[in-house]
Amino acid sequence: MAEQVTEATASGVFCSRILNMVNTGDVNAIILAQRHMLDRFEKTNEMLLNFNGLSNVRLQQMSDRFAHHTRTLVEMKKDLDIIFRRIRMLKGKLAKQYPESFNNVHESPILEDDDDFDPTLKSAATTIATSEQSTESCDTSPSIISPAMSQDFEDLSQAPSDTPSVNGQILTDEELVHED
């Protein structure tokens, strides 16, 4: 039993010496620095949570707007597809009903800006494709054959025409009545 008391005393002495080696001022400074860092991290965490909340709200708003605009664009594309399909059908019907007149029609080039208009382009006008060519394509843009690319191209804008026209455009019956 005496040995146990001396062992406890030896271990107690050892522990007390180790504790005396540690500077309590340094330990308190470390604890104070850790509390200060903890406060800063908590504030930063709160700011990040607020930022994430605002970002999520803004993301939801932008996602809704993006979805709305995407739906609008898809609807517009469908509408344009329907319009161009109807145009191709009408061109096909006109080509079958009036093949000679349809082949004589010249379409002026589409100009992006009126300032770029050059009247010399009329002589190199493009012709509208036949109904077989326009219905084969799934393209939503009108089919146009370039005069330079077509070997069978005949420049009809210089030849006298049986149908009345103004600036290369064939006049309708109503326009003829108004012009007389």
Swiss-Prot record:
Biased segments, Polar residues type? 130-144, 158-170
How does this chain assemble? Answer: Associates with the BLOC-1 complex.
InterPro entries given for it? KXD1-like, KxDL_dom
Q: What is its main location?
A: membrane
Q: Which organism is it from?
A: Xenopus laevis (African clawed frog)
The protein's gene is named kxd1
Q: What is this protein called?
A: KxDL motif-containing protein 1
* Organism superkingdom: Eukaryota
Which PANTHER family does UniProt cross-reference here? KXDL MOTIF-CONTAINING PROTEIN 1
